[in-house]
Each structure stands twice: as C-alpha cells, then as structure tokens.
Amino acid sequence: MKRIMIVDDEENIRFLYKEELEEDGFMVELAKNGQEALDKLSLFKPDLITLDIKMPGMDGIETLKRIRETERHLPIIMCSAYGEYKQDFTTWASDAYLVKCADLTELKTTIRKLLGLL
C-alpha cells in the first residue's frame, strides 16, 4: 500500500484529500504545517507528499527545500488555492503543481502517475 502525506494548514482540505485517497487504497498521514511534516517524515516514510504553498510558520517552499536536503527522489506535488505559482514549480524542485480542490480526479491521476501506478 502506497503512503501519502498531506501537508496543508486548512483542516477541511486535509480531511477531504484523506477521505478521497483512502477510498482509493492509499495510506494517508496528515500534517498541518511544514514543521509537523518534517517531524513525521522519517516515521511515516511517505511515497509521495502533497504540500500546500502558503502556510503559517514554515511555508511550503521552505518545507520543500528542507525535504529535498535528504529526500531528492520523493515525489512532491505543490498545491495552492491560486494558479499564480504554476510557472514556478519546476524551479522549486517539485514534481507537479495543482490548484487545490479544483479537480480531485486530477489530484488522484497525478498521484498515480508520479507513483508509477498508471
């Protein structure tokens, strides 16, 4: 079973993604901010992370940089409520960029592609 970590400061987004992905057979761990994600990373050992860009404290971009220091090949999907960052995601060393909640089918398809399940 593939393991996914959802990192988002919005509780409703975390639980929506968790419910949808667990229905598809994924094991899901939640983190409400970047520091919590870093703390859980070595214990949960996710196969993929979805990471919100704008969060209080350590934002998604800083969290991504910290993760990449040790996890260069871990697929990471950057998420934002706005499409304004789409052109920047490759410079951050992320694997994909999605607008949050725009299309859960797109989220699930992107996850499957990055995990080699399609």
Q: Where is each model-derived feature located?
A:
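Short amphipathic alpha-helix used as the core "switch/output" element in two-component signaling
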Residues: D39, I61-R72
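Acidic catalytic/metal-coordinating carboxylates
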Residues: K32-E36, D59-E62
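Active-site residues of response regulator receiver
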Residues: D52
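Receiver (REC) domain active-site loop signature in two-component systems and cognate sites
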Residues: M55
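Alpha4 helix (beta4-alpha4-beta5 surface) of REC/receiver domains from two-component response regulators
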Residues: E62, G83-K100, T105-T109
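Charged docking surfaces used in two-component/phosphorelay signaling
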Residues: F15-E23
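Short hydrophobic/Thr-rich beta-strand motif most characteristic of the beta2 strand and flanking loop
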Residues: G25-K32, K40
